[in-house]
A protein has these predicted regions:
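Extended, folded cores of ATP/NTP-driven motor/assembly subunits in large transport
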Residues: 1-213
Length: 213
């Protein structure tokens, strides 16, 4: 099966996009074509939108933290289509102004201060008793210092690092749409499930994930 990549861009950016693609993929061949059509007469369609499971400040797992090329999982699903089937993954992006990073910085600070993940522990009366006894025996300043040190763990440090790394990148509003076409609703839905599963690789347990909407 042949997998095609289409890029729809404003006319004044065509040259820029062509140069960018060939700079990363020197063997690629780019040509202008008519708009494609997935659908055929009497075809059945299944589709969904993918969106972030948590707030946008939390990053996804990217290829830097993967052991394999993430495109392989996606292309493997598309390569198994039969002659009567079709599928498309549409990603629309639009850059946003700087300022979105502010929420990420605030969230990173909250995590370090244990406000974001430590709320339930603050409701535990044993924690209150322990803090009170520590305050009486060793003083407030020392207790605060110990709490600040204890709040940071390798997992928290890694999470905060990932958030801060995301804040250094250009921000985009993004729309991801998956479309599956087949000769029956059952087959179209099954194909869509396979397509959605390919995006599980971008999930992390402590940050973000892509979920169906």
């Amino acid at each position: 099966n042949l997998i095609d990549f289409y890029a729809v861009v404003p006319f004044h950016l065509v040259s820029v996009i062509e140069k960018t693609i060939t700079s990363f993929y020197s063997d690629s061949y780019i040509e202008e074509v008519e708009d494609y059509n997935l659908f055929t007469k009497n075809s059945k369609v299944a589709y969904c939108y993918m969106h972030d499971h948590h707030e946008y400040s939390l990053p996804f797992r990217t290829y830097q933290r993967m052991t394999t090329d993430p495109l392989n999982n996606i292309s493997n699903v598309l390569s198994k289509l039969h002659g009567h089937e079709g599928a498309a993954i549409q990603v629309m992006i639009r850059p946003v102004k700087d300022g979105w990073q502010k929420k990420g910085r605030s969230l990173a600070k909250e995590i370090l201060e244990d406000k974001h993940h430590g709320f339930l522990s603050n409701l535990n009366p044993l924690v209150w008793i322990g803090d009170f006894l520590s305050l009486l025996m060793r003083g407030e300043s020392k207790t605060d210092a110990e709490h600040s040190a204890s709040r940071s763990t390798p997992m928290i440090d890694e999470q905060v690092k990932a958030i801060e790394e995301k804040n250094t990148q250009t921000g985009y509003e993004t729309l991801i749409r998956l479309v599956a076409v087949s000769n029956s609703e059952h087959h179209a839905e099954a194909l869509l499930v396979s397509m959605k599963s390919a995006f599980a690789q971008y999930a992390t347990t402590d940050n973000n994930a892509l979920h169906e909407r």
